[in-house]
């Protein structure tokens, strides 16, 4: 199963990504890195630097075709 995690470079998102990778899922991360850090993202995950408010996320969906989305992206 392929899972897209928005906000996967943040504290909670990166820990979720690590766990999903550990469990054997194919993980895709979409994050604009406004508060998260690239170094937080598990190397086994496909990473896209993209703002979820823009059309860039559409390209991620078309290319990766995730089965599930876990939405953790937010601006505070």
Show which residues each predicted segment covers.
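N-terminal Rossmann-like NAD(P)+-binding domain of SDR-like oxidoreductases, especially those catalyzing
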Residues: 1-76
